[in-house]
């Protein structure tokens, strides 16, 4: 096998969920049928790696010092939604009418993996809360053990700065049937039920 082909296969393996076989299929596809697409992919990847950084305010990906959301004068600066990843921010932007600002952790607390408050930029978040503009912090971390631990830490941080913490509701999926919902989800939904208005 060609050394360059081996390097291409190994390069594809850096992507999440891509093992040896998938990487091999991708490499063969690019070389057999999509050489022009491969050139565009290489150019876009090279350009993005060089030019895309993090917003100094929210830590989202951007080509500028401050992203378009943080720079927008039409956003509600009293609400700050804290998410684990840029993909989570994008999901909230597309699915809701949320008009506040964001803070992207780029992960979640995981002491076993060496990810603590410093790695998540929580010192920067603390400074932002201390500035006094934010009145509500919406905690939108995932419903995993690490996500819940992160949410607890964030709620404490918000309270230290007299900011009201709120957490996204969790439980029954829209259109879901009780008999098909897993026990943990059903138990959580039942325990956090709310009054019908």
Swiss-Prot record:
GO terms for biological process: DNA recombination; DNA repair. GO terms for molecular function: DNA binding; zinc ion binding. InterPro entries: DNA_Rcmb_RecR, Rcmb_RecR, Rcmb_RecR_Znf, TOPRIM_dom, TOPRIM_RecR. A zinc finger (C4-type) spans 55-70. CDD domains: TOPRIM_recR. Pfam families: RecR_C, RecR_HhH, RecR_ZnF, Toprim_4. It comes from the Bacteria. SUPFAM superfamilies: Recombination protein RecR. PANTHER family: RECOMBINATION PROTEIN RECR (PTHR30446:SF0). NCBIfam families: recR. May play a role in DNA repair. It seems to be involved in an RecBC-independent recombinational process of DNA repair. It may act with RecF and RecO. Belongs to the RecR family. This is Recombination protein RecR. It comes from Xanthomonas axonopodis pv. citri (strain 306). The lineage of its organism: Bacteria, Pseudomonadati, Pseudomonadota, Gammaproteobacteria, Lysobacterales. The gene is recR.
């Amino acid at each position: 096998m060609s050394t360059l082909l081996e390097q291409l296969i190994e390069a594809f393996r850096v992507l999440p969920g891509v093992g040896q076989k998938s990487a091999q299929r991708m490499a063969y596809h690019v070389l057999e049928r999509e050489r022009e697409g491969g050139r565009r992919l290489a150019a876009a990847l090279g350009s993005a790696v060089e030019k895309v950084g993090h917003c100094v305010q929210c830590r989202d990906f951007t080509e500028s010092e401050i992203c378009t959301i943080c720079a927008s004068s039409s956003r509600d600066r009293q609400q700050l939604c804290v998410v684990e990843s840029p993909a989570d921010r994008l999901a909230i932007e597309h699915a809701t009418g949320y008009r506040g600002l964001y803070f992207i952790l780029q992960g979640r607390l995981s002491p076993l993996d060496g990810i603590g408050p410093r790695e998540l930029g929580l010192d920067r978040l603390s400074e932002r809360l201390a500035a006094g503009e934010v009145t509500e912090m919406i905690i939108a971390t995932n419903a995993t053990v690490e996500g819940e631990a992160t949410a607890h830490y964030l709620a404490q941080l918000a309270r230290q700065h007299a900011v009201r913490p709120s957490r996204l509701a969790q439980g029954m999926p829209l259109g879901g049937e009780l008999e098909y919902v897993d026990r943990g989800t059903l138990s959580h939904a039942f325990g956090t039920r709310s009054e019908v208005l």
